Amino acid sequence: MLDITKNILDVARFLFGLNDQLKATERQRRADMAALFEDISNCLTATSGGIRAGAIPHGRCAELITYAQALPGVIYQEVGEARARELGDMLHSAYAVEQLAMRIAQSTDKESYLAQLEEASGKFRALANLIRVGL
């Protein structure tokens, strides 16, 4: 269950590593990718903040699933269909953020798991900003 945070971070790191490739795409595709990456970042930030405050991030599961389902359609031209599906599946495997919140709250490693979520959020946000402007 706690591999969820690692999966999310792995997706963010992989996509961030493709920054040059992603920002080379045409403007509308970059805008679509940036919007999705920013939405993912916002979801992760809200999830982490909720967990840190001792709350269960209700509704974030459905939100993250929606983004995971949209991801392959947004990045497949840049990474290939198989890899796009794999990344979408990895993000989708993290759907149980409400259960994650309950597990993390009881964990002695709570801060390290939250740090992974926050790092992933930061990478998604930075990538969104970089590809939006083509930098």
PLM regions and their residue ranges:
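Small-residue hotspots
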Residues: 34, 41, 48, 94-95, ...
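Short, cationic, amphipathic peptide segments
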Residues: 1-23
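Long, hydrophobic, amphipathic alpha-helical segments used as structural scaffolds
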Residues: 23, 41-44, 48-55, 76-86, ...
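Long, amphipathic, charge-rich alpha-helical segments that form helical bundles/coiled-coils
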Residues: 71-114
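Mid-sequence acidic-hydrophobic segments that form the walls
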Residues: 11, 15-18, 97, 104, ...
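Amphipathic, membrane-active segments
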Residues: 16-70
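C-terminal amphipathic alpha-helix
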Residues: 105-135
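Short, charged, amphipathic alpha-helical segments
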Residues: 58-66, 88, 114-119
